[in-house]
Amino acid sequence: LGFTTKNWKGGQSREKWNSNNKPKTPGRLNDLRHIIYKGGDTHWRQAKNNLGLMLKEGLLKENIDGEAISWAYSRLRKRKEERKILMVISDGAPVDDSTLSVNSGDFLEKHLKKIVKYIEEKSEIEILAIGIGHDVSRYYDKAIKITDVNELGDVMISQLSSLFESKKNYH
């Protein structure tokens, strides 16, 4: 799964807020784009063209992480697998200029922390994050930072192996 915003500078969400006389503390002011690169039941061969979308120029814009994590979590909760792991690949902090220009500067960060805390403390789903070039441990209890995107594959395997090994030791 992937996520971004549909527009720079807010799009329809911002226009609607403007036309409603700009009420105070409006919350998110950008249109979301949630992307299913590969569904849980889709074979890798069927998804390979979709995976190439990650590299499409102009697709990725701003990041409203909390709502994206919530969306991914709700999809994962519906799955029938016994064990569920939500691995987040992050390039840093949630940022959306349209939203942050009219809400508190930590609005998106607070929301992300709230969502992650709920998953970590009250959910059967395990969540971990890999920050590319950024330390994301202020958002996620299980987090690792890498400096080079070329490390990503090996670190993903290593982190998953550690999770499986730690779970095995409990039984």
Question: Would you name each region that the model predicts?
Answer:
Residues 1-171:
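Acidic, glycine-rich A-domain
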